[in-house]
Amino acid sequence: METEGERVRRERAEELFAEAHRQQMAGDLAAAKRLYRESLEMCPTAEGHTFLGWTYSFEGRWEDAIAECLRAIEVDPTFGNPYNDIGAYLIELDREDEAIEWFKKAFEAPRYESYCFPHFNLGRVYEKKGMFEKALAEYRAAQKENPQHRGAQSAVKRLQAMKN
């Protein structure tokens, strides 16, 4: 059971996390990083590490982003976002073969609301490798998960046009 002090720390950490996210979306990455770190010092969470990693990715700091995602997985291996994010960062580093396994791990994560992202990203890998049928299947799976995913929509159209 959570003590009163632990509850207060957790709630403050959640406030810091929310403010960090606002700053990140506003483009103030320095403030976002500082606030994510403060939040993590108070209460380490998978979300905090994942979003700090995402902030690093905005700066092209792929290895730092991956390191934060690995910390997120240590905190909560059921959280799906860091698996997908590691795969996406590996694509940026031209390490597609390594990325595939991370996307597959994202599919297995029980606490994940955006399965369209690993499908879309896996489609990107397959398309880059010239495996167009597999890519198309992944893009369609992304569309099924999220019919509004514009990247998946355009990828499906592009690959279907290549077939004709």
Question: What do the PLM-derived regions correspond to, one by one?
Answer:
Residues 41-42, 75, 109-111, 145:
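Structural marker of alpha-solenoid helical repeat scaffolds
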Residues 9-47, 51, 58:
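Alpha-helical segment of the N-proximal tetratricopeptide repeat
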Residues 12, 45-46, 79, 115, ...:
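Residue-level recognition of tetratricopeptide repeat
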Residues 25-35, 59-71, 93-108, 129-141, ...:
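Structural signature of tandem alpha-helical TPR/SEL1-like repeats
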